[in-house]
């Protein structure tokens, strides 16, 4: 019988000290979802880089720090030793900062964008705190909140309105995030809940191969790594194209 890796995720560092804070940020996934904001902004007719940068900063605070701090408060899925009061403080300050960026940006540029601030706040709290019995903590809401919404916000922050390209880009974000969720669900299950794996594969030539925990999730984790890199490279290519 083989045991899964002691790490709760493929990007988690060894526990302790500053490494816990790096792991808390989910670096590849944060970069993945910030790329959606960039993609949305680059789909706009003309790119205002300052406003796009502000949108990326807001999502870096809300998703990269705030959402992940709230998630870690619930059951310690990353097994960090960060004190609960510190996680609460990180969540409150980062989410408040993201909201402040949104409010100031909307007042300075396009007042209707204020609507997106409470929507984003609701999505962060409802998903990560599993409000209403976890109704919003589902694959679909993950796709909408972490895939579609960032694209919409990136486009709106730059263009000041919403066009067909924004909604098509949002659909791309939703579908790709759903694919991410399908892959990561199995990986998280094995890494965080399974304590042992026993089995073997019998090939048509009679040869037998041992089935262990690492083999169970190797394909999914390789796909997640490649998808994370793909989205970041796509966002970078779109920035280079629009410069």
Feature roles, as predicted:
Residues 1-126, 144-243:
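Hydrophobic alpha-helical transmembrane segments
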Residues 129-141:
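Membrane-helix interface "capping/anchor" motifs
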């Amino acid at each position: 019988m083989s045991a899964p890796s002691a790490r709760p995720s493929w990007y988690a560092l060894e526990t302790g000290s500053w490494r816990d804070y790096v792991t808390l940020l989910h670096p590849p996934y944060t970069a993945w979802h910030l790329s959606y904001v960039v993609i949305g902004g680059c789909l706009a007719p003309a790119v205002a880089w300052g406003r796009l940068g502000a949108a990326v900063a807001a999502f870096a605070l809300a998703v990269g720090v705030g959402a992940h701090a709230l998630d870690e408060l619930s059951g310690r899925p990353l097994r960090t030793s960060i004190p609960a009061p510190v996680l609460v403080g990180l969540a409150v300050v980062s989410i408040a900062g993201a909201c402040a960026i949104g409010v100031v940006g909307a007042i300075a540029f396009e007042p209707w964008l204020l609507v997106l601030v409470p929507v984003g706040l609701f999505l962060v709290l409802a998903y990560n705190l599993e409000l209403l019995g976890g109704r919003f903590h589902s694959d679909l809401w993950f796709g909408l909140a972490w895939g579609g919404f960032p694209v919409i916000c990136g486009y709106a922050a730059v263009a000041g309105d919403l066009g067909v390209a924004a909604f098509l880009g949002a659909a791309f974000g939703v579908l790709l995030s759903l694919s991410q969720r399908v892959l990561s669900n199995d990986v998280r299950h094995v890494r965080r809940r399974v304590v042992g794996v026993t089995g073997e594969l019998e090939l048509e030539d009679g040869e037998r191969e041992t089935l262990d925990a690492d083999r169970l999730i190797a394909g999914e984790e390789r796909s997640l790594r490649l998808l994370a890199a793909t989205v970041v490279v796509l966002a970078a290519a779109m920035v280079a194209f629009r410069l």
